[in-house]
Amino acid sequence: MPKVQVVNMQGSPVGELELDEYVFGIEPNTHVMHQAVVGQLASQRRGTHSTLLRGEVRGGGRKPWRQKGTGRARAGSIRSPLWRGGAVLFGPKPRKYGFSLPKKVRRLALRSALSSKVNEQKLIVLEDLSLNEAKTREMVKVLQALNVGKKALIVTDEFMETIDRSARNIAGIKTTAVEGMNIYDLLNSDVIVMTKAAVTKTEEVLA
């Protein structure tokens, strides 16, 4: 079973924690992680792009000149896709890009991402994370004590407004509850900071 050091908010070690091997100790499946990231980013696309086809563009109903005898190439409409100001051929229309993955695949992707962070020693487990008031400077002190870099994801067992508001104005820092964890944020963060309670809840959800 993988083990990680548990630290307090001052960055001092206070013990060790054995992690569930099924959640934090598997061989990361890069293909599944890629699928999950592509699926998440695709679902965020608005897909509102639209072009005018030949039947939608204004004008062009009359033949511009007679078929024969002018010496020019034959033309049936001034809105042909070949013409300047003409319609678009096979252009994009509004559509949904999102696709859903099976629940097992989504969970495997999360377990793979968490395991990869453990392998890279980029998982920090906090004994507890509690602030008296929602102040950015208080969160900055904690992050500095933990030696967290520019991009980090803070995961708590449940939504905590003081934590969320304290980290909101810090560039590169995101906060989430266990239920809101997603593959993109996990992989896009240099460090994952999880409370001990969040680790326990994650193991319950993904086990």
UniProtKB/Swiss-Prot annotation:
A Gene Ontology BP annotation from the UniProt entry: translation
Record's function text: One of the primary rRNA binding proteins, this protein initially binds near the 5'-end of the 23S rRNA. It is important during the early stages of 50S assembly. It makes multiple contacts with different domains of the 23S rRNA in the assembled 50S subunit and ribosome. Forms part of the polypeptide exit tunnel.
Subunit composition and interactions: Part of the 50S ribosomal subunit.
Pfam families attached to this UniProt entry: Ribosomal_L4
Record's protein name: Large ribosomal subunit protein uL4
Lineage, top ranks: Bacteria, Bacillati, Bacillota, Clostridia, Eubacteriales
A single Gene Ontology CC term: ribonucleoprotein complex
Signal peptide residues on this chain, from the entry's feature table: none
Keyword Ribonucleoprotein: yes
Family the UniProt entry places it in: Belongs to the universal ribosomal protein uL4 family.
Spans annotated as Disordered: 56-76
Gene: rplD
InterPro entries, per the entry: Ribosomal_uL4, Ribosomal_uL4-like, Ribosomal_uL4_dom_sf
Bias type Basic residues, positions: 60-71
Transmembrane segments: none
Keyword rRNA-binding: yes
